[in-house]
Amino acid sequence: FEIYNKDMLSSDKKYTLNNIPAAYAVMLQNMETITRVYYGDLYTDNGHYMETKSPYYDTIVNLMKSRIKYVSGGQAQRSYWLPTDGKMDNSDVELYRTNEVYTSVRYGKDIMTADDTEGSKYSRTSGQVTLVANNPKLTLDQSAKLNVEMGKIHANQKYRALIVGTADGIKNFTSDADAIAAGYVKETDSNGVLTFGANDIKGYETFDMSGFVAVWVPVGASDDQDIRVAPSTEAKK
């Protein structure tokens, strides 16, 4: 167990998998799926049951709790190929040359498309966007702009980071105040478009991330916001 646990804390993994948090960030946001969370991703296998938390514990738990508050509505997934600063273009490793950034948007409670503007109580304070890149050497040109449609119902609305990749690993924020105080806050335009630039998206090689991952959510949700729906046996039309 010692070798395995040490490998989880390494950025150069030999026995464990890279990007466990990013995988959960994608799965826990997906529409009409129920994600099975693996015990070994939350806790180490040595010692007593649930005795020692894994290095991914905080991020996975943050994502699971945020699912209750934010993950609802229609979904749009898209990949973008953004201009780079040229430093990574001559690498012999194909992965290190890729400039792909994957995005997945959930529009919010009772909002099924980006054009919907008639929602309900929690429509504006729910929804989220997940950003993932697999290139740890990704460096974008300063002109690069990633424009993500959060939905027109989210026009002129502030968003803040829930998780965000940094050179020191993934940072977690469990409140609006903490994320805003750290400077991780943005505002959509009049069409509900949220824009990310070269300073927002960058590849890193850390124990919990090989590439980049971030999740952004609307500012203003109450601590007890719950957008889950009641179970039903009715067939979906």
Q: Which stretches of residues belong to each language-model region?
A:
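Solvent-exposed beta-hairpin/edge-strand motifs
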Residues: 149-168
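Acidic carboxylate-rich catalytic motifs and surrounding loops in phosphoryl-/glycosyl-chemistry enzymes
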Residues: 38-44, 75-100
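Extracytoplasmic/secreted cell-surface and envelope-processing proteins
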Residues: 46-50, 139-141
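Acidic glycine-/aspartate-rich tracts in secreted/extracellular proteins
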Residues: 135-137, 166-167, 220-223
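Conserved alpha/beta catalytic core and glycan-binding cleft of carbohydrate-active enzymes
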Residues: 1-45, 59-69, 108, 121-122, ...
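Short, polar loop/linker segments at the starts of domains and inter-domain junctions
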Residues: 5-17, 52-60, 142-147, 169-199
